[in-house]
């Protein structure tokens, strides 16, 4: 998020989390949960989507984490298609033009966009930076910005979703920078 005033940093990996930085200062909030968007309910959940997701470890139903974390992505795929694949196998299927994997990844991007639309509508960040293992899927960046535009309140969304610069070490670098 270098060079931006309002940054929403996202982790999509084993879990889902986030952080907010305004004018290069991390915003923690009264309860120190600022940016904890993994436990908002996926906006606009359909009955079909409710069928193919497990209850979140936090005890609630429909948390974004159960849809867009790596384990959530593979769990939803396995429930829908009666398989036992991990996210890497699903992505391999996508690369090989396997129909179920293509469907799953397009749905993943839609779920990610719906979750990020809440962030955009409330925070209106300059940029959203994705990190974590799932952020390494290049197909996300080919589609997420256009998909996000369908769900935000404005017709002229300027916020961009971008990949982190430092790869899997981005979180460690950020923590070190803050200490």
Describe the residue ranges of each PLM region.
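ATP-binding/phosphotransfer module of carbohydrate and carboxylate kinases, centering on a glycine-rich
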Residues: 1-4, 44-179
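Glycine-rich phosphate-binding loop of actin/hexokinase-like ATP-binding domains
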Residues: 4-64
